[in-house]
Amino acid sequence: MALIEKMTKDIQQKGGLIVSCQPVDNSPMDKPDIVAAMAQAAVNAGAVAVRIEGIDNLKATRPLIDVPIIGIVKRDLPDSPVRITPWLNDIEALAAAGADIIAFDGTDRLRPVPVKALLEHVHRLGKLAMADCATFNEGMYCHQLGTEFIGSTMSGYTGGEIPKLPDLQLVTALAEQGCRVIAEGRYNTPMMAARGMQAGAWAVTVGSALTRLEHVCEWFTQALKWQQELDK
């Protein structure tokens, strides 16, 4: 719990930004040294933690920063839609590489390893756990199991059209039940991040708007094209 206390203090002093340093897959930025540099820059600018995907990226980042790292492994499985840290050996690899917090998919979907087993393995290795959830019931289930952090990460990403705005209602509902909520997913502007905190988030994770240059360039390009069409 010492880490949680330290993070809580840092959040109170610095504002509660967690930066997800996950470049677009196979892009020019998708290299461990660049991911590590992103993480360093984020910490220098006041991030209280970073979220890192992949063992090589984590190993490159760990020696360079002293804030907590939320570690994940993403996989594309042939028989399950679950992508985030689906296996027990993923947890072992993340712990060995220096993750302080290990995040896993906490959704109620077909999976190779039950959520409870993933959580127990994280704790067995002396790490804190974060469950990336999509719904209130999923979040509460993980919270009641003893998961330290509940992320709204998967809201909008388990089927159907992806919403444009964050799920603030989910953040509020979970926070009101005593969950330590990390708001994540479509917090693409400072104002939306602030609204996440207002909704009850313990911290807010921002990814694409900070570390996926291609996405941000596309947002600007689309806005300019839209204006050009209006001016015709």
UniProtKB/Swiss-Prot annotation:
SUPFAM superfamilies: Ribulose-phoshate binding barrel. InterPro entries: Aldolase_TIM (IPR013785), NanE (IPR007260), RibuloseP-bd_barrel (IPR011060). GO terms for cellular component: cytosol. The keyword Phosphoprotein does not apply. It holds the Pfam family NanE. Gene3D superfamilies: Aldolase class I (3.20.20.70). It catalyses: an N-acyl-D-glucosamine 6-phosphate = an N-acyl-D-mannosamine 6-phosphate. The keyword Acyltransferase does not apply. Keywords: Carbohydrate metabolism, Isomerase. Its EC number is 5.1.3.9. One of its GO terms (biological process) is N-acetylneuraminate catabolic process. Pathway: Amino-sugar metabolism; N-acetylneuraminate degradation; D-fructose 6-phosphate from N-acetylneuraminate: step 3/5. GO terms for molecular function: N-acylglucosamine-6-phosphate 2-epimerase activity. Converts N-acetylmannosamine-6-phosphate (ManNAc-6-P) to N-acetylglucosamine-6-phosphate (GlcNAc-6-P). Belongs to the NanE family. PANTHER family: N-ACETYLMANNOSAMINE-6-PHOSPHATE 2-EPIMERASE-RELATED (PTHR36204:SF1). This is Putative N-acetylmannosamine-6-phosphate 2-epimerase. It comes from Proteus mirabilis (strain HI4320). The lineage of its organism: Bacteria, Pseudomonadati, Pseudomonadota, Gammaproteobacteria, Enterobacterales. The gene is nanE.
